[in-house]
Amino acid sequence: MDFQSDLTREISPQRKLGRGKIEIKRIENTTNRQVTFCKRRNGLLKKAYELSVLCDAEVALIVFSSRGRLYEYANNSVKATIERYKKACSDSSNTGSISEANAQYYQQEASKLRAQIGNLQNQNRNMLGESLAALSLRDLKNLEQKIEKGISKIRSKKNELLFAEIEYMQKREIDLHNNNQYLRAKIAETERAQQQQQQQQMNLMPGSSSYELVPPPHQFDTRNYLQVNGLQTNNHYTRQDQPSLQLV
């Protein structure tokens, strides 16, 4: 019973949408039909975009309004997707038609990439001055302008690097000069300190000039010396009553 009721609801022409039930049939009112078309179209385009992004699917959507206006969406290209669809449908009887269509599609993409690579290689050779026979006068002028523009950029960058290198070397020269002056000052200071130390050691050595010889005393007058001694002797030994020493 439940399955039959569910099936009946699915087959019923009425579906519950939003706030109430909307009967799925042609809308007679032109204004309401246009408003509904815009809303449903935007929702359909949004779903197609989400499907292509989330599932990495190739999606192409084509919609014609009642007035014949075209609306389309494709994550790659509508024409490419249609061509792919035609190729897949033409070989629908064959079990490997889809894989063959995919193979053909990838072959076409590979051929496009090879053509792009060939063009880039030719441009590279032309920039080097090779394979110029197939170029016209206009192509040669365009090539010349590109090369001159490239050379101008290269020279500008080279000069910029040279100026930066010169500025660095000048700064380095100033630093070395300052370091040299500092080292010279330190060497001179060290030499002065050594000289002062040597001078102090020389001054402390005996017999150096700092120790002045004491001048010899005045010469004694021998006559005076003898006279004084004689007088002193007479004074000491004139006394006859001086007791003599006796040994016991």
Swiss-Prot record:
This is Floral homeotic protein AGAMOUS. Signal peptide: none annotated. Probable transcription factor involved in regulating genes that determines stamen and carpel development in wild-type flowers. Gene3D superfamilies: Transcription factor, MADS-box (3.40.1810.10). Residues 103-193 form the K-box domain. Keywords: Activator, DNA-binding, Nucleus, Transcription, Transcription regulation. GO terms for molecular function: DNA-binding transcription factor activity, RNA polymerase II-specific; protein dimerization activity; RNA polymerase II cis-regulatory region sequence-specific DNA binding. Residues 196-219 are annotated as: Disordered. It holds the Pfam family K-box. It is found in: Nucleus. The keyword Transcription applies. Residues 202-211 have a biased composition (Polar residues). The keyword Cytoplasm does not apply. One of its GO terms (cellular component) is nucleus. GO terms for biological process: positive regulation of transcription by RNA polymerase II; regulation of transcription by RNA polymerase II. Residues 19-73 form the MADS-box domain. SUPFAM superfamilies: SRF-like. SMART domains: MADS. Coiled coil: none annotated. It comes from Nicotiana tabacum (Common tobacco).
